[in-house]
């Protein structure tokens, strides 16, 4: 299986990499949050742009991206607008969503973009090609904050992302029971062993699913999300605790 290298970080080998999400509403809070995050122990900085108020002003969005780049130049920067339908803060049109991601790609400030699988097949394929032409990696994602589908469906979605040439397919699902967590882990393992030719990221959310955020190296998830301050999704644990557990499991 091929790995994905962003800056000096190799994703898809060793312990799962830690991603943290920065959620700030304006330039001033982007700056202050970035300074606080700079001291934390993590691998990839995700900027959750859907929390940013001045979204219609592309210059303002890119000015904020520039601050993040300048504050943490060595950290891979993942640009993510999470749509309202997949658990994000704002709803925008598909056209605006694609335009925003293209602007991020054009800026030269971001290393990776998050692209939701169910945006529309043609738009997704075109945006992946555009990102790759500009040396930007794509994390292709799907989130369900209500339920966990059958393992076959989880695998089908991850394989579809892979067929669309995502660098890293990602799926996050809400368990309604502990057996749903096992479904997610079994699907992850089957995907990783039988179909994946690149790193994947999977997680089961909320307190019930916490084990999935810790056991990625065992089942085949290449990265996990931790919290510096406020969790960006239910079930995230602090980066310091997360690193400790991931290291213990890696060295066992």
Swiss-Prot record:
Disulfide bonds: none annotated. It catalyses: 3-dehydroquinate = 3-dehydroshikimate + H2O. One of its GO terms (molecular function) is 3-dehydroquinate dehydratase activity. It comes from Escherichia coli O17:K52:H18 (strain UMN026 / ExPEC). Keywords: Amino-acid biosynthesis, Aromatic amino acid biosynthesis, Lyase, Schiff base. Its EC number is 4.2.1.10. The active site is at 143 (proton donor/acceptor), 170 (schiff-base intermediate with substrate). Involved in the third step of the chorismate pathway, which leads to the biosynthesis of aromatic amino acids. Catalyzes the cis-dehydration of 3-dehydroquinate (DHQ) and introduces the first double bond of the aromatic ring to yield 3-dehydroshikimate. PROSITE patterns: DEHYDROQUINASE_I. Pathway: Metabolic intermediate biosynthesis; chorismate biosynthesis; chorismate from D-erythrose 4-phosphate and phosphoenolpyruvate: step 3/7. 3-dehydroquinate binds at residues 21, 46-48, 82, 213, 232, 236. Belongs to the type-I 3-dehydroquinase family. Pfam families: DHquinase_I. Transmembrane segments: none annotated. GO terms for biological process: 3,4-dihydroxybenzoate biosynthetic process; amino acid biosynthetic process; aromatic amino acid family biosynthetic process; chorismate biosynthetic process. SUPFAM superfamilies: Aldolase. The keyword Amino-acid biosynthesis applies. Homodimer. It is an enzyme of class 4 (lyase). The lineage of its organism: Bacteria, Pseudomonadati, Pseudomonadota, Gammaproteobacteria, Enterobacterales. This is 3-dehydroquinate dehydratase.
